[in-house]
Amino acid sequence: MRCLLMSIKQNWCELILKGEKTIEIRKSRPQELSTPFKCYIYCTKTGAKEDSIAKPGKVIGYFICDKIIPIRVFEDGLIQDWNWNSLEKSKVPYDDMATYIGHGKIGYGYQISNLKIYKEPLDITESKTICNGDCDSKCEKCKYYYYESSEDGSYAECMVNNIIDVTRPPQSWMYTYEEIPRNDKTIII
């Protein structure tokens, strides 16, 4: 099943873990997924504290995004007010939200539900993503690409069905697959 892997700063992860933040703000939304879908949470290392309840540099859990709220920011920086009550659950101050999304632009509020947190946070390399041939090595140079030439012709294929390990966290979010090991590693919050 296709999912998202989302990078979230440690201070926001802490609020999510405490149940205080139930909306995550983003400038974009996945076009290939419809709600509900699973979002894995990667706690970023930037400005992180080691003594936090949210372990930096790890996949700390996941949530189900059961609704995406469009956030329209007008040219003057005002946010369309009909959805502000929901957006307050993001814990992002009004002016910061407008600045982040950009004047005259549309952003998105991902509603967080069914939060599950790992007892032992996972390394990013335990995540999987799709290889679309846009990587630096291209398919012909990829370590997962198999090519064989014979008198009857040549044969080539991707040995991993275009699903590869994630090697670095996403800037914001990326598509991933529900292949992260979960054996007794989750608790329900």
Question: What spans do the regions from the language model cover?
Answer:
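Structured alpha/beta reader/binder surfaces that contact nucleic acids or chromatin modification marks
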Residues: 1-189
